[in-house]
Amino acid sequence: MPREADLPHVGRLVDAAAAAGVDALEIHNLGVLRVLREKGGPVPAHMGAYANVYTHLAAGVMRDAGAVRVRPNAEVSLEEMAILAREAGVEVEVLVHGKIPLGVTDRCYLLTEPEESDPKCPSICREVHWLTSRQWVLKTVGKGVLSGRDMCLLEHLPRLAADGFRIFRIEGLYETAAYRSEIGAAYREALTVAFAGGEYALENRWSDAARRHAPRGLCNGYSFGTAGRTYVGTVLQDANHEV
């Protein structure tokens, strides 16, 4: 989250990204989106999880300001996302797997001194830190709080295909290379089957990968209008030991 003193640096980052030929910039701040627009939009703008996209009206504002893709906030259901995509006329990115972003700050919770002087930065955020209270768990990464359970829509990919969604995200930030590789491979195969339009059933290797990389269990987030930590499904329900 840029502050006033960061704005000149934001402009330089946009220039550097354009020179490097990146596919897009993920933006979580309308001020940064304006900087990109004032520079002529040299790089496509994708609005991220902290941009407060809850309705098609908000998505429309960001579209008019230059965004070509939006990621609705975690609390937005799949039904609401479909309306948002249709009414705003903008690409919608759907989180299908991984930790759910729940909060962000520009100050690191894990450090005891300012970033520029704390010797633990940036190594400390590469470690795993959990916030626990009885039955619930959250993961802190310093400047953000993530869900403890992994979002998992493996069982529901045919619905996503039928609803017209085409942009999918696996949240692999702060995860291991094995997590990104194995979960990514499972979804690549599963999405291919789902979009083929035939019979869809989870392969053991897909569900095994989901279980193996979710030590705190699985959930569907708010996709179906339920509590965020709930899992709706039949095959992977057993991943949540306390349920």
What annotation goes with each model-predicted range?
Residues 56-57:
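Conserved nucleotide-cofactor-binding alpha/beta core module
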